[in-house]
Curated annotation (Swiss-Prot):
Keywords: Aminoacyl-tRNA synthetase, ATP-binding, Cytoplasm, Ligase, Nucleotide-binding, Protein biosynthesis. This is Glycine--tRNA ligase beta subunit. The keyword Ligase applies. The keyword Protease does not apply. It is found in: Cytoplasm. GO terms for molecular function: arginine-tRNA ligase activity; ATP binding; glycine-tRNA ligase activity. PANTHER family: GLYCINE--TRNA LIGASE, CHLOROPLASTIC_MITOCHONDRIAL 2, GLYCYL-TRNA SYNTHETASE.
Length: 689
């Protein structure tokens, strides 16, 4: 069977840069799944993506599906014919479905009986016939949140489509995809190379596009070139380029023929906080900032043009002219904002609504101030500094700089606080109050910042849950999931002695009578414990380990983490499996009994040596582990409890629990309850699989 290279390219108008990679990867995954489901053998599936095209190249694609034998069993012979040997309606209906008559059917005989059988040789369909529908189906499944319609057509896609090319080897596959008839013509760069190129074979792609069309269709090659050229350009001026992955991806998705150039701006702008300058360069202009070896921003930036100009200086000058007014704005805002103290912005917070039922940003500031001070007292931070940080926490939102460059909130508060002579940990806290902003982000660096960050997030959680507006589905307008996980990360990773229950109660109390949800505390705790589940699953913990700890509903995050590590270690012990099974057995026995158990085990009632031995061991371990549990040394406790494996196994082998003697039965049940209580001090081990 001959194998050929298959090429599909969809030529479009400029695709959304932030979605380009995901579109291409999804397209490749969808087509691969279609090929596999159809049984079409193939080699590597390679994807290509540029601003105006999505393409796939499939190596060694089989010319057709393999032929296959089809067998379809019909009714049993006893039901297929009546007493006179005439076919039954069931048999005739089955035969019609197979496209035959009953007398054309074969018979299948096994040791269980005899049935009608249809057997046929089905010839595999050609790849040429199957591919158009596969491509159309794969495109329809792309993750496109908002589709476009263009012209008079009813066709919808992420952007208008101009060309479609489907080549199997050197043969053009006739098809209409997204309203466009397939053709050999592909389009080159808008301003360089040949505008239209006729491609003869699939193997010519993407080289023909590179050489004649001046388009680097290989996404990874384009990205690597931008990265290497930008690093070299930065070295040429004695610096290091800030090549953040997200911006590098976005720039890669914006250009077809990357040309890296270096430009500069006036050194006077370096007096403005670098964060504001970087925000302008990266966020607005898609430029790469350049830093000196000491980490200070240089008066240069690197950008990527989409054309190879005969006069690159003209492009450089143009970009310098574009960025200068933005930097001048930042300079003006910075100088204007510093003419008054940060604290002077407090009254203006009264004019900005936080949430209609929960009041203004000034109301939120007052709550954060009080809660940050309370948290600081719990964790041993400077209470005065924490309350001061709380008071100033939202003041920078009223500054010109943050109003214009919104992503500088927090960091500008820090710079203005330093200018005003505030304590350094207060200034730093203003910047770090929003941390962690995303998974893997840094945590607040000092205790005051931790207190403020937790206070800000807990105020939002208590308030929004307090009016019954918890997240539903994908909708989370107040970013409560991120806030909850942020609080948990800070408490766990900083090992802070905070309890979610008292923390939520205090946050809710500060709202006065504004909250309408009487179950706000439990709702917030349940929500945060749910975030714990997601966090630990991402960390690689098994679901049953998480469930075992969640069953105890510990509300101190640092304590929760200690239990998780203890149970995870317990699972590695040789005794773990048997003790988990024993706990499950004990749990089931106790659940089925509705008898009132004794607070203490009556040693005089014990008869069998095995139950005496187990009871003694339980008492010894209870006394021994009491201080261990109190200090949260759960791993040590579970290692000690692993010693119970042998006496527990022996007990269940030799002793009947549910005996007729009521006093003896209750005593044995009471002993098992005491045994289970020991393990429940850490987690519900019975849930381990």
């Amino acid at each position: 069977m001959s194998e050929k290279t298959f090429l599909v390219e969809i030529g479009t108008e400029e695709l959304p840069p932030k979605a380009l990679r995901s579109l291409a990867e999804s397209f490749a995954a969808n087509v691969t799944a279609e090929l596999d489901n159809a049984g079409l053998a193939h080699g590597n599936v390679e994807w290509f993506a540029a601003p105006r095209r999505l393409a796939l190249k499939v190596a060694n694609l089989a010319a057709s599906q393999p032929d296959r034998e089809v067998e379809k069993r019909g009714p049993a012979i006893a039901q297929a014919f009546d007493a006179e040997g005439k076919p039954s309606k069931a048999a005739e209906g089955w035969a019609r479905g197979c496209g035959i008559t009953v007398d054309q059917a074969e018979r299948l005989t096994t040791d269980k009986g005899e049935w009608l059988l249809y057997r046929a040789h089905v010839k595999g369909e050609s790849a040429e016939a199957l591919l158009p529908n596969m491509i159309a189906t794969s495109l329809a499944k792309l993750p496109i949140p908002k589709l476009m319609r263009w012209g008079a057509s009813d066709v919808h896609f992420v952007r208008p489509v101009h060309t479609v090319t489907l080549l199997l080897g050197d043969k053009l596959i006739p098809a209409t995809i997204l309203g466009i008839q397939s053709d050999r013509v592909i389009r080159g760069h808008r301003f360089m190379g040949e505008p239209e190129i006729t491609i003869d074979t699939a193997d010519q792609y993407p080289q023909i596009l590179l050489e004649r069309g001046k388009v680097v269709a290989d996404y990874e090659a384009r990205k690597a070139k931008i990265k290497a050229d930008a690093e070299e350009a930065a070295r040429q001026i004695g610096g290091n380029a800030d090549l953040s992955e997200s911006l590098l991806e976005e720039v890669t998705s914006l250009v077809e023929w990357p040309v890296v150039l270096t430009a500069k701006f006036e050194e006077k702008f370096l007096a403005v906080p670098s964060e504001a300058l970087v925000y302008t360069m990266k966020g607005d202009q898609k430029y790469f900032p350049v830093y000196a070896a000491d980490g200070k921003l240089l008066p240069n930036f690197i950008f990527v043009a989409n054309i190879e100009s005969k006069d690159p200086q003209q492009i450089i000058s143009g970009n310098e002219k574009v960025v200068r007014p933005r930097l001048a704005d930042a300079e003006f805002f910075f100088n204007t904002d510093r003419k008054k103290r940060l604290e002077d912005n407090l009254p203006r917070l009264q004019t900005v609504l936080f949430q209609q039922q929960l009041g203004t940003l000034r109301d939120k500031t007052d709550r954060i101030q009080a809660l940050a001070g309370w948290i600081a007292e719990q964790i041993g931070a400077d209470v005065n500094h924490a309350t001061r940080a709380g008071l100033l926490s939202k003041c920078d939102l009223m500054t010109n700089m943050v109003f214009e460059f919104t992503d500088t909130q927090g960091v500008m508060g820090m710079h203005y606080a330093r200018h005003d002579g505030e304590a350094e940990d207060v200034a730093v806290a203003l910047n770090e109050q929003y941390q962690p902003r995303f998974a893997g982000d840094d945590l607040p660096s000092n205790p005051v910042a931790c207190a403020l960050a937790i206070a800000d997030k807990m105020d939002t959680l208590a308030g929004i849950f307090g009016i019954g507006q918890h997240p539903k589905g994908d909708k989370d307008p107040f970013a409560l999931r991120r806030a909850a996980l942020g609080v948990l990360r800070i408490i766990v990773e900083k090992n802070l002695n905070l309890d979610l229950k008292t923390l939520t109660e205090e946050a809710a109390r500060l709202y006065g009578d504004k909250l309408t949800n009487a179950n706000v505390v439990d709702d917030v705790i349940d929500f945060m414990l749910g975030r714990f589940r997601a966090w630990y699953q991402d960390e690689g913990y098994t679901v049953d380990t998480i469930q075992a700890v969640l069953a105890r509903r510990p509300t101190r995050p640092a304590d929760f983490d200690a239990r998780m590590k203890a149970v995870s270690h317990f699972r590695t012990l040789e005794e773990a499996s048997a003790l988990a099974a024993a706990n499950k057995r004990v749990s089931n026995i106790l659940a089925k009994s509705d008898e009132v158990l004794n607070d203490r085990v009556n040693a005089a009632t014990l008869k069998e040596p095995e139950e005496i031995a187990l009871a003694l061991q339980v008492v010894v371990l209870r006394d021994k582990l009491e201080p261990v549990f109190a200090e949260g040394r759960y791993q040590e406790a579970l290692v000690e409890l692993a010693e119970l494996r042998e006496p527990v196994d022996t007990f269940f082998e030799k002793v009947m629990v549910m005996v007729d003697d009521k006093d003896l039965r209750i005593n044995r049940l009471s002993m098992l309850a005491k045994l289970r209580e020991l393990f429940l001090q850490v987690a519900d081990i019975s849930l381990l699989q």
